[in-house]
Amino acid sequence: MSEYKDTLNLPETGFPMRGNLANREPEMLKRWYKEDLYGEIRKAKKGKKSFVLHDGPPYANGDIHIGHALNKILKDIIIKSKTLSGFDAPYIPGWDCHGLPIELMVEKKVGKPGQKVTAAEFREKCREYAAGQVEGQKESFKRLGIMGEWDKPYRTMDFATEANIIRALGKIASKGHLLKGFKPVHWCTDCGSALAEAEVEYKDKVSPSIDVRFKAADEAALLSKFELTEGHEGQGDISIVIWTTTPWTLPANRAVCLRDDLEYVLIQTEGDNAERIIVAAELAKDVMDRAGIEHFHNLGFAKGADLELSQFQHPFYDFTVPAILGDHVTTDSGTGVVHTAPGHGQEDFAVGNKYNLEVANPVGSNGVYLPDTELFAGQHVFKANDAVVEVLKEKGALLHHHAYEHSYPHCWRHKTPIIFRATPQWFVSMDQAGLRAKALESIKNVEWMPEWGQSRIEGMIEGRPEWCISRQRTWGVPIALFVHKETAELHPNTLELIEKVAKLVEEKGIQAWWDVDAAELLGADADQYEKVLDTLDVWFDSGVTHFSVVDAREEYNGNSADLYLEGSDQHRGWFQSSLISSIAMKDEAPYKQVLTHGFVVDGHGRKMSKSIGNVVAPKDVTNKLGADILRLWVASTDYTGEVAVSDEILKRSADAYRRIRNTARFFLANLSGFNPETDIVPVEEMVALDRWAVGRALAAQEEIVKAYEEYNTHGVTQRLMQFCSIEMGSFYLDVIKDRQYTAKRGGNAQRSCQTALYYIVEALVRWMAPIMSFTADEIWNEMPGQRDKFVFTGEWFDGLFGLAEGEELNNEFWTEIQAVRGAVNKLLEDARKEKTIGGALQAEVTLFADDALAAKINKLEDELRFVLLTSAAKVKPLGEKTDAAQATDIEGLFVEVAAAEGEKCDRCWHHTPDVGTIEGHEKICGRCVSNVDGEGEVRKFA
């Protein structure tokens, strides 16, 4: 063999079998950034049709988690596939940089604003902290192979973006969508000010626990809603009973709240003071025990939904309140009926908003009831608790009263109990100027993927309250408005003033608003107006990025976003805040398509949790397996539902990766010595099987590109695996090894094969590029021929071709041949087990086939043996089958396996009768002699 080894076309490549991705990828990244890969893509795509995927900004705090990786990798796959489809698809990553979590982290380091540091210094520290967090996350995303404007991302704290956020507020105000209203906030009566969530501590407190009767305003109407089980209506007053530990809020009560699906019971108490009481059926016994009522029975039942809008008498004021429905009502404790004071609770406020309840706030900033508060004027709320209880007793409204110890919010400064108190807040109104209706209409013009996203966001928009956009925080974009001190009206020149403030912020950042003297902007009007010192909800910051970023960045050339892609929780979040703000500003949706992915869970479907110990960190995966494995995991999942990840699942991704890598390596190794400039074989001169293989690649490419266009990465990876493992690995590559290794070097038989391999790998590397970006780049650099520096700057390979119309050896033919080959292989395997033969090349097979099948198989002539990987193969009529012939799974086909005649050729390992008969080449067969010394064998079919 050694004397003929140099005559073989042995595979040779610098592309290693082992990916060693964890070590190799960082080196590739260095090259990408040194040679400005992203800049090269932008240059190559300049002037092409635009595709804009707008990045929803992650929060600039903490390390990235596996959900971040899933999201960013999906975006990167889509961007890269669009680039290969000929689009100019820039990617500008973003970060959400204002808000409470950053404030909390900074407070730990420098204390609260106004203590050791001024508010201005505190904001600067927040800016520094957020900038550091962005840099950390940025490096993590880059390690995943995400390409984008990393040197010029958008950050909501960039001066230009902050200025544009303020401009967005001005536009919304100018369109009539801004509204000033009231909303309950944490309020310290000792500070006389609102508290942020961070300024609230929880400690145990003893409060009065009371069950209070609200009498039915119309007993007959109320009874008609119950299904009476006793055959009579009972006797005594009818009351619905609420439970509360804040009696002082009862003057502000404006409703009783039930849950629609809870069952409520009408109870008849027995004895001298018989009455009828309504509570949740599940809690009835607890309520009766608490009230010391031993003798009672049930009169009837009704669902909460049936009792909606029933009217009840306020326990001590002369007005009625409705029964309303809310999801926050539970049966954990109480009566299943919640006292609702929209001015004194966030849930009360939210549910009250849906029913347009009055937001009554009878309490001043010092915690004292206002002078016009009937019965309790001038009393401090906590001292008034006893007074409220006494009034309830006098009115006969108190069912039960006892002391109750519970966890209660306290001021972090004064260590005293706080209250919820409605204070003026700014809202984007959903109905004042028709915003809700326009938003609902615009939803129909957006493509929602999955489709259920449409009904989900429609339901949310239909039912949502006004959007409260104001916050009493330090680190945030200011609500840069001036309001009249007496009328509370906005300044008539608000839009012009907004632009002036925006220009200041562009130059100096948000601190400019707190620094600027009102007289600088308002002149003589300054004394009549006051600055709004609230900041904007961070959802406003990110929600208006369609304007502050997409409209503003030159990379987008004035194009609006084609696609928003985030987790399914963003129907409630970013998708919604973006939609509302865009409709408010532009009367159109900010996106054409919205695609959502599910949450990442472990292999058992559980959420990621440090306590369970099932957290998979992206950094751990890239350090161990490499980013391409993580990217392949993302692409291989059906991300529309929950996405499972575990060590076992990642191992499966690594196995799939190895199969794809080995396929690519086979292509590259067998293209050794091939120059596309000089060695390409014309289509009509190619071996039939090679033409078929290129045609299969074309069919695969059409399906893969379509799957990419539909954002179906799961479909891409499935088709890619099928092509590599089945069409190539199990058939084509297996068959061509003999020809590729043993054919005359540079002859048509070898070059035809290499031409096919070259065309296919040109396509394959592009299919891989959006998903396995590092590996695709590695393959690209090992491929023969002149080419661009990077695979990512090009487009899908257009050199593939299908089989010509009328081709005799068509796709159907090769499908049948593969079936025949499979049937023969089974019998060869049996013969191996029985030791009739060693390997397939020690066998010769005789196929006894019916006329139709024989006619097809015979089209391969003497090359049938190369397809079957045997040393000899004959086809005979079915009627001549021998006793040794065995049936196969194919009707009309029997096969006889026998040991091949002749000696083994030292070069190709085939057993043929002519080995040892050729002078000068006694150890090799005639075919090999031709390939070594002659013109080379001729192959037409395989």
UniProtKB/Swiss-Prot annotation:
Any binding details for the cofactor? Binds 1 zinc ion per subunit.
Q: Which InterPro entries match?
A: aa-tRNA-synth_I_CS, aa-tRNA-synth_Ia, Anticodon_Ile_BEm, Ile-tRNA-ligase, Ile-tRNA-ligase_type1, Ile-tRNA_ligase, M/V/L/I-tRNA-synth_anticd-bd, Rossmann-like_a/b/a_fold
Gene3D superfamilies for this protein: 1.10.730.20, HUPs, Ile-tRNA synthetase CP2 domain-like
Q: Where does Zn(2+) bind?
A: 905, 908, 925, 928
Record key words, sorted: Aminoacyl-tRNA synthetase, ATP-binding, Cytoplasm, Ligase, Metal-binding, Nucleotide-binding, Protein biosynthesis, Zinc
What does the UniProt entry say about where the protein is found?
A: Cytoplasm
Q: What is its EC number?
A: 6.1.1.5
State the name under which the record lists this protein: Isoleucine--tRNA ligase
Q: What is the lineage of its organism?
A: Bacteria, Pseudomonadati, Pseudomonadota, Gammaproteobacteria, Vibrionales
What's the gene? Answer: ileS
